[in-house]
């Protein structure tokens, strides 16, 4: 059974909701809808599900209930019925460095499942979602792809930067000040002030971290209105965008433009180029693969390497640079960047978008980057001539790994392994000064099944950066790295340790070599020794044996397959 194929007039704007609003046999359905305040006239109107990831406990999401009200007002003004509903969210910033991080990636698929569930059960004709934090965005798009009903994503927007002693702060400042403190570089009073001032209000983490990366990719993909990714959360333009979404979704209904008409192979290509140029998070690899699979578009980790090879890294945005998303909006925003990429022939812009026009048609009517801006370099003088995301393979990652290398760290690293079976052990070693320059830190059993949930390693990378070792230490994991992570880092190593991947066989002192020019990741141990180690290896017990994480362990695919759970 599929809820996406009702028996009704295929040309009607209410072809889904009419399944319950029109038949006399569905009187009970209609009685309950009348109870919500709908009128007899409303029963003939299209119904739009408005899915918000609002919850109070996270700055990224705490304002979404108000934005959902603005979206509903726009839907009502457009002559339709808006029905708000909520789904879950997990704050990566709050759960980072704790066992709570195991629930983060899993929340992406729960969001997709819950949106698909309510849209299918309630028979809404179209969907507008309001995500805030990292996993919210791909969760929304995966649901849209599965449902294939007219859909728009309205990003909750980015946070304003904080400030302390005339320096801009963001969430990564709050992470890194711990490493600075244990290294004796700042006092406890300074550390406390940085923490208090890093997040001054509502909105997602301010740099080109995962939330802004995914919002940017989704705008380039065509599933959000122009400027959605760069308008700050508390800017008046964000409320205006919410209200415009009503008329936009009406046009999609009239033209019967659906996610699978927009999310084409060409759209994913343009999205990948855009995020590479802006220095987006490695998490985009995982999420775009999952989104593509939801619409049956083939996309692999090798495709990211192909795009990276031909796309220069242009944007001086945090975490590797000094600007934040609000700064980018002030010089033209996401559309201005894409307009420049289109002019340079780096994206094609041929795919349909939620405006009912192609991306190129949208950009033709919008201004370019402001003259004299310092955030986005030219293609002729880039920060790096190729992309920062590298797909590595070798004896340590036979099925692939994802590195984030901007060029500031160098392109090769070789050194002795320092192996830790969880991030807590690594942090303890750092505090005890056991990690030295030249080391390759390995944090394993943090993959999709082993973590479980492939937790992010922002706390360890931030601690290393704060301790002044960022240029002298490499870090590898079968877990993920936050969009806020920077340094010489390699994640998404597959096969993961829990299933017996080579990362499980590393011992302290083994030489590991990372080469971002040859895209290789190798464990310098001979095959006979590795085979001897494998014969003694046994998988550790699963960290979850009941409940939602156990279900996730049983269902999740590998990182190279997007960690999807519905195949």
From Swiss-Prot:
The active site is at residue 482. Keywords: 2Fe-2S, Amino-acid biosynthesis, Branched-chain amino acid biosynthesis, Iron, Iron-sulfur, Lyase, Magnesium, Metal-binding. [2Fe-2S] cluster binds at residues 60, 133, 205. Residues 1-24 are annotated as: Disordered. Mg(2+) binds at residues 92, 134-135, 456. Belongs to the IlvD/Edd family. It is an enzyme of class 4 (lyase). One of its GO terms (molecular function) is 2 iron, 2 sulfur cluster binding. Binds 1 [2Fe-2S] cluster per subunit. This cluster acts as a Lewis acid cofactor. Functions in the biosynthesis of branched-chain amino acids. Catalyzes the dehydration of (2R,3R)-2,3-dihydroxy-3-methylpentanoate (2,3-dihydroxy-3-methylvalerate) into 2-oxo-3-methylpentanoate (2-oxo-3-methylvalerate) and of (2R)-2,3-dihydroxy-3-methylbutanoate (2,3-dihydroxyisovalerate) into 2-oxo-3-methylbutanoate (2-oxoisovalerate), the penultimate precursor to L-isoleucine and L-valine, respectively. The gene is ilvD. InterPro entries: DHAD_IlvD/Edd, Dihydro-acid_dehy_C, DihydroxyA_deHydtase, DiOHA_6PGluconate_deHydtase_CS, ILV_EDD_C, ILV_EDD_N, IlvD/EDD_N. Its cofactor is [2Fe-2S] cluster; Mg(2+). Pfam families: ILV_EDD_C (PF24877), ILVD_EDD_N (PF00920). HAMAP family: IlvD (MF_00012). The keyword Amino-acid biosynthesis applies. Pathway: Amino-acid biosynthesis; L-isoleucine biosynthesis; L-isoleucine from 2-oxobutanoate: step 3/4; Amino-acid biosynthesis; L-valine biosynthesis; L-valine from pyruvate: step 3/4. Homodimer. Its EC number is 4.2.1.9. This is Dihydroxy-acid dehydratase.
